[in-house]
């Protein structure tokens, strides 16, 4: 920790921003004094369809959110690079992020990084609270 300041790091793709993203970031921000967000690089998104919105635009959108103090693009080669550079006290994962908390904490410790991992399990109850749902609705109604 930086004195009494707690830095929280949230990560994600943030493709087609929606209320679910906002809830995740609001809950993440509430855990500390500063929220830094790592936006996934286009090339690194392999666990789901590639983002519709390019990484530079996703970064710009996330940076503009009032609860976000800083947003950066992730590393192309090493997911731990931004963690080493920004030294968060807490790393949050969204309810649907595929990363296992125990594995992540173990990997952080191996690298001498002491951030605590917190899963934000709350979900926003809305019809279009995922980028996939938004894309599917657009395809259904507009194509």
From Swiss-Prot:
It is an enzyme of class 2 (transferase). It catalyses: FMN + ATP + H(+) = FAD + diphosphate. Coiled coil: none annotated. GO terms for molecular function: ATP binding; FMN adenylyltransferase activity. Its EC number is 2.7.7.2. Gene3D superfamilies: HUPs (3.40.50.620). Its cofactor is a divalent metal cation. ATP binds at residues 13-14, 18-21, 96. Signal peptide: none annotated. Pathway: Cofactor biosynthesis; FAD biosynthesis; FAD from FMN: step 1/1. One of its GO terms (biological process) is FMN metabolic process. Keywords: ATP-binding, FAD, Flavoprotein, FMN, Nucleotide-binding, Nucleotidyltransferase, Transferase. CDD domains: cytidylyltransferase. Homodimer. Belongs to the archaeal FAD synthase family. Catalyzes the transfer of the AMP portion of ATP to flavin mononucleotide (FMN) to produce flavin adenine dinucleotide (FAD) coenzyme. This is FAD synthase. It comes from Methanothrix thermoacetophila (strain DSM 6194 / JCM 14653 / NBRC 101360 / PT) (Methanosaeta thermophila). The lineage of its organism: Archaea, Methanobacteriati, Methanobacteriota, Stenosarchaea group, Methanomicrobia.
